[in-house]
From Swiss-Prot:
Coiled coil, from the record: none
Membrane topology: Multi-pass membrane protein
Keyword Repressor: no
Gene Ontology, cellular component aspect: plasma membrane
Keyword Magnesium: no
InterPro entries: P_starv_induced_PsiE, P_starv_induced_PsiE-like
Name this protein carries in UniProt: Protein PsiE
Family membership: Belongs to the PsiE family.
GO biological process, one term: cellular response to phosphate starvation
Key words, A-Z: Cell inner membrane, Cell membrane, Membrane, Transmembrane, Transmembrane helix
């Protein structure tokens, strides 16, 4: 089997990194469009006087924050030298579970399990921010 030289491997890594960067840039632009669409949807839900629309408004706000967090994650990726900080994924997970509790709160056991998952993510976040796991 042909072995690749170090310069070839670096070229492959650079090409793949550029493909990843282009993909994330495209995803970021798509998320900005969805964020704008969600802003219009929230404005519509805000001025509808029905009680059901208030429920939609809260759900829409949480979805809005999810888009916002994903965009912030992509921005942080480019600003931190092509690295995804773990805590941003934890923030997104917490927000997604809160949205799930708001949307699907049919059984108390499900809400309890979702709350336990949030507690586990908060503990993970605390551990990530502690001095033992902090990356310099």
């Amino acid at each position: 089997m042909m072995s690749l030289s170090r310069s070839h491997l670096e070229l492959i890594a650079t090409i793949l990194q550029n493909v990843l960067n282009l993909g994330l840039l495209t995803l970021g632009l798509i998320l900005v469009l969805f964020l704008g669409k969600e802003t219009v949807h929230l404005a519509d839900a805000l001025f509808v006087p029905e009680q059901a629309s208030k429920y939609e408004l809260v759900e829409g706000l949480v979805i809005y924050f999810l888009y916002f967090e994903f965009i912030a994650l992509i921005v942080k990726y480019f600003k931190s030298g092509f690295h995804f900080p773990l805590r941003y994924f934890v923030y997104i997970g917490i927000t997604a579970i809160v949205r799930l509790i708001i949307v699907d709160h049919k059984t108390p056991m499900d809400v309890l399990l979702y709350s336990a998952a949030i507690l586990l993510l908060v503990i993970t976040l605390w551990l990530c921010n502690s001095n033992r796991l902090r990356r310099e």
